[in-house]
């Protein structure tokens, strides 16, 4: 699928690049700042605990993370809660990194990964207690198919957690979808990305048969997360540029565009759904 191959232009870059500006867990999505003194590292751990709480995890559950990145969520849930985790990513380099980290943490038997596209992979029906998509649906062409697939692999009573950046509303999407900044992020950074209004994601979830249990506005948290990333990019610019001249400036430009839109054109939400039947 073209969208999967295109997103690899960003996510399959050398993992060391992301290690220069992300937290030690290399979590590449919004953190959660519970206090003014929270660092990026502590805020990302806060966020992982928040996800576990929203999912109602108690330990030992079967969890599927779609768009698992460098494994921050599955490694955390395996290490802290003993969950049996599966991560999906189209970027081969991420899988090698996760395997190394799982072995180093002593949780290799609880962590597996699959290279490919969620809608196309062979996954067990009702095989998971929880499914997570953190910043993943933006890279998937058909959200209706994503939610239908998530319902298929969740057990009855299982929980789906989705966090995603969204246009504020349909009118904003119409006005800004073709702007230069939107095109730069979509094409020059990710290769494929499609911001949608929250209403479209909720409709897709409900049409798939999910019950919505909560919606959280995490926009301010993502604004602060990206500000911390920008500071780290600036501090590590020379090391980042060692992987390609001008790469640090390109990353900074992308992050600045993202932060300029919060509350004006874009929001970031956490949506929790239950597979009630």
What are these regions (language model features)?
Residues 70-81:
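Conserved SAM-binding loop of SAM-dependent methyltransferases across substrates and taxa
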Residues 84-89:
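Conserved SAM-binding motif I beta-strand of class I
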Residues 119-131:
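A short acidic, Gly/Pro-enriched loop at the edge of an enzyme's catalytic core
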């Amino acid at each position: 699928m073209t969208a999967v191959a295109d997103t690899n232009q960003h996510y399959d870059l050398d993992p060391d690049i992301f290690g220069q500006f992300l937290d030690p867990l290399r979590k590449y999505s919004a953190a959660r700042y519970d206090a003014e003194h929270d660092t990026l590292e502590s805020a990302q751990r806060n966020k992982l605990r928040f996800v576990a709480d929203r999912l109602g995890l108690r330990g030992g559950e079967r969890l599927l993370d779609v768009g698992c990145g460098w494994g921050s969520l599955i490694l955390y849930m395996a290490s802290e809660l003993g969950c049996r985790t599966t991560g999906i990513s189209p970027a081969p380099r991420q899988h090698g990194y996760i395997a190394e980290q799982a072995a180093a943490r002593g949780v290799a038997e609880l962590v597996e990964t699959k290279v490919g596209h969620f809608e196309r992979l062979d996954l067990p029906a009702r095989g998971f207690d929880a499914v997570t998509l953190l910043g993943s649906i933006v890279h998937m062409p058909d959200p209706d198919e994503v939610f239908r697939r998530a319902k298929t692999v969740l057990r009855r009573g299982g929980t789906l957690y989705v966090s995603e950046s969204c246009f504020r509303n349909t009118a904003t999407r119409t006005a800004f979808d073709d702007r230069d900044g939107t095109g730069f992020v979509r094409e020059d950074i990710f290769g494929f990305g499609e911001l949608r209004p929250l209403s479209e994601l909720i409709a897709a979830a409900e049409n798939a048969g999910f019950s919505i249990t909560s919606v959280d506005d995490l926009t301010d948290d993502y604004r602060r997360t990206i500000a911390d990333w920008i500071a780290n990019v600036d501090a590590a610019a020379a090391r980042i540029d060692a992987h390609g001249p001008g790469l640090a400036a390109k990353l900074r430009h992308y992050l600045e565009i993202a932060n300029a839109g919060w509350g004006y054109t874009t929001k970031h939400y956490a949506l929790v759904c239950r597979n009630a039947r």
